[in-house]
Amino acid sequence: MSAATVGKPIKCIAAVAYDAKKPLSVEEITVDAPKAHEVRIKIEYTAVCHTDAYTLSGSDPEGLFPCVLGHEGAGIVESVGDDVITVKPGDHVIALYTAECGKCKFCTSGKTNLCGAVRATQGKGVMPDGTTRFHNAKGEDIYHFMGCSTFSEYTVVADVSVVAIDPKAPLDAACLLGCGVTTGFGAALKTANVQKGDTVAVFGCGTVGLSVIQGAKLRGASKIIAIDINNKKKQYCSQFGATDFVNPKEDLAKDQTIVEKLIEMTDGGLDFTFDCTGNTKIMRDALEACHKGWGQSIIIGVAAAGEEISTRPFQLVTGRVWKGSAFGGIKGRSEMGGLIKDYQKGALKVEEFITHRRPFKEINQAFEDLHNGDCLRTVLKSDEIK
């Protein structure tokens, strides 16, 4: 990192979303110096997630434009503001959309990985002081996104929204731990706490669903049923540890429902099911496929604005449980190091999710990759921005 840039604005290339349903504009912006309790990061690698596409689609009620999207990113700290003690210039880091201040009632409860420190301002697309660090060539302010904004050569985040990692961990893989991989893996290990011999079903087998599958396999689940309407996902599901694959459009008997199919396959239902689709009908199916008396269904997928879930109360009265999971229940600053170690020793697959690589200037094509049945993650390299 150059000392010449410390404390000064930096001009760099970013992908700006000016409006919903429009291509991102790859252009030069100005990134202000970090203020107190803020960190400026040179993003080395970033990936495109369905959440970015969801906001760009205009369906996100918290979506604000213009903004710099991106929340799966890793890089190197360029400079820090006053009173930052957790990271320093030169550190290899991952940006965190789920902050961890360690002081709020959420962090001190021991019950959740949610944090209240920056939630209000993060949802408004600004830094904790209510202002933005991004400006376009016309001097117009640009909103932040999920406290990360990794679709920029440089970004500024709150010091509670970044974690230093082992510099030996390759950043192109590490960036995926900023969302999808951690979300699914953590949901299996922390939220559900899958145990040896448990039966598991995963609805939706993208990066999050496959990460649930590998977490369940690591814990020794006896049956892991992957459910997806895209047969191209079958090979990935097997690779990450699924024992069975069901395509609801092809593998059900006449008039049979997916719930009936799963109950038939598991002698009464599953110990754990995971919804990774965001489809509220599938959320209901996932719950009702759980075993009476103890089955738990974990909701990971984010539904569209205004959507509601429903089931017959008897499903819950008879012992089934609905739970939610954000970022896999993982506390980003205190527990990310453990995930990095799992990756380094081979217990957690990460690089296997990188099916596509592109230079940053092809970011709009990377969004198109998401709709390709063969794509799990497209990783963009910052050095190839210009």
UniProtKB/Swiss-Prot annotation:
Sorted UniProt keywords: Acetylation, Cytoplasm, Metal-binding, Mitochondrion, NAD, Oxidoreductase, Zinc
Disruption phenotype: Accumulation of S-nitrosylated proteins.
Residue sites binding Zn(2+) 2 per the record: C101, C104, C107, C115
Annotated PROSITE patterns: ADH_ZINC (PS00059)
GO biological process, one term: furaldehyde metabolic process
GO cellular component, one term: mitochondrion
Catalysed reaction, written as an equation: a primary alcohol + NAD(+) = an aldehyde + NADH + H(+); a secondary alcohol + NAD(+) = a ketone + NADH + H(+); S-(hydroxymethyl)glutathione + NADP(+) = S-formylglutathione + NADPH + H(+); S-(hydroxymethyl)glutathione + NAD(+) = S-formylglutathione + NADH + H(+)
Induction: By formaldehyde, ethanol and methyl methanesulphonate.
Cellular compartments annotated: Cytoplasm; Mitochondrion
Catalytic activity, EC: 1.1.1.284, 1.1.1.1, 1.1.1.-
Record note on cofactor: Binds 2 Zn(2+) ions per subunit.
Remarks, miscellaneous: Requires GSH for oxidation of formaldehyde or of methylglyoxal, while oxidation of long-chain alcohols is independent of GSH and enzyme activity improves with chain length. Present with 8370 molecules/cell in log phase SD medium.
PANTHER family cross-referenced by the UniProt entry: ALCOHOL DEHYDROGENASE (PTHR43880), ALCOHOL DEHYDROGENASE CLASS-3 (PTHR43880:SF12)
Described purpose of this protein according to its UniProt entry: Oxidizes long-chain alcohols and, in the presence of glutathione, is able to oxidize formaldehyde. Is responsible for yeast resistance to formaldehyde. Also acts as a S-nitroso-glutathione reductase by catalyzing the NADH-dependent reduction of S-nitrosoglutathione, thereby regulating protein S-nitrosylation.
Protein family according to the UniProt entry: Belongs to the zinc-containing alcohol dehydrogenase family. Class-III subfamily.
Official protein name in the record: S-(hydroxymethyl)glutathione dehydrogenase
Species of origin: Saccharomyces cerevisiae (strain ATCC 204508 / S288c)
Organism lineage string: Eukaryota, Fungi, Dikarya, Ascomycota, Saccharomycotina
Gene coding for it: SFA1
